[in-house]
């Protein structure tokens, strides 16, 4: 099917008026033009300040549950993009209690950390692996990636406000304007840093992120990860939320230490 280009009437009239003038001046030498370099986007202080306030809020939370409904694009060898959907639920109780459940189109995984033991559970296959481990939630997220090759979805939630996500890494920052996510009044921000464009919608009342869009600029097709977040910062979390108890048909396996680049536990 051929593609049709439809131009506004006003633009057609303008082109008709300009055409004779262009014909009359066709014999004149054309001045050599120099391409103008696109201006470098600025770092707006108000945008960086909003990110800083959000990071402080995240680091101040002592106990919370957050659910992210997400889509992730994967680029095939053909250059085509496939979109996968899923969700992840985090339950966190500072300083050292962690639970994550990942349920995507391709896999299910649960992660438990009770302050002394880290468990990875694959409910569909009924396999689980455990390792003794101590430290804070932030240390767990880092260890899971660096030692076992498990990169938690939305790991930035645990890194904002720490030296792993310094504000100095932001190369441009723009306040797009007000927006609403699931009826929550937000400020919409656009950021750029090396290899990544990302957008965040921050709730005006709670200062918590309500939506994230992350574009990978290292890939020419710029695949995106999109997540909408729902927060609960008031419901209490029990110790049992962070401890794994195997069922009769669950089987233990060993955790292999990382021998290859980390793969994100999609979504």
Language model: regions and residue ranges:
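N-terminal mature ectodomain segment of secretory-pathway/periplasmic proteins
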Residues: 42-127
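Conserved short hydrophobic patches within well-ordered secondary structure
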Residues: 2, 58, 201-202
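Flexible, processing/modification-adjacent segments and terminal tails
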Residues: 28-30, 35-52, 56-59, 121-186, ...
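Bacterial N-terminal signal peptides
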Residues: 8-18
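Gly/Pro-enriched, hydrophobic low-complexity segments
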Residues: 42-45, 69, 104, 119-120, ...
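Bacterial N-terminal signal peptides that target proteins for export
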Residues: 1-9
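A short, polar/proline- and glycine-enriched secondary-structure boundary/capping micro-motif
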Residues: 77, 109-113, 122-123, 130-132, ...
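Sec/Tat signal peptide C-region and signal peptidase I cleavage site
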Residues: 19-23
């Amino acid at each position: 099917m051929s593609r049709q280009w439809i131009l506004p009437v006003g633009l057609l009239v303008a082109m008709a008026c300009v055409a004779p003038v262009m014909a009359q001046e066709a014999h004149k030498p054309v001045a050599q033009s120099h391409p103008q370099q696109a201006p470098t986007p600025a770092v707006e202080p108000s945008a960086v300040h909003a990110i800083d306030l959000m990071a402080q809020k995240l680091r101040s939370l002592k106990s919370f549950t957050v659910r992210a409904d997400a889509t992730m694009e994967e680029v095939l060898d053909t250059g085509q993009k496939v979109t996968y959907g899923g969700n992840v639920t985090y339950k966190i109780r500072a300083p050292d209690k962690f639970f994550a459940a990942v349920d995507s189109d391709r896999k299910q995984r649960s992660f438990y950390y009770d302050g002394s033991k880290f468990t990875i559970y694959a409910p569909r296959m009924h396999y689980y692996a455990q390792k003794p481990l101590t430290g804070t939630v932030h240390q767990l997220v880092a260890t899971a990636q660096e030692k076992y090759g498990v990169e938690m979805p939305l790991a930035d939630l645990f890194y904002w406000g720490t030296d792993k996500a310094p504000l100095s890494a932001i190369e441009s920052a723009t306040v797009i304007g007000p927006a609403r996510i699931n009826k929550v009044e937000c400020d919409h921000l656009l950021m750029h840093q090396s290899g990544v464009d990302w957008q965040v919608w921050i709730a005006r009342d709670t200062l918590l992120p309500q939506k994230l869009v992350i574009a990978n600029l290292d890939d020419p097709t710029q695949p995106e990860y999109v997540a909408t977040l729902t927060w609960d910062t008031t419901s209490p979390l029990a110790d049992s939320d962070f401890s794994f108890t195997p069922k009769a048909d669950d089987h233990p396996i060993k955790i292999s230490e990382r021998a290859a680049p980390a793969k994100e536990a999609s979504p």
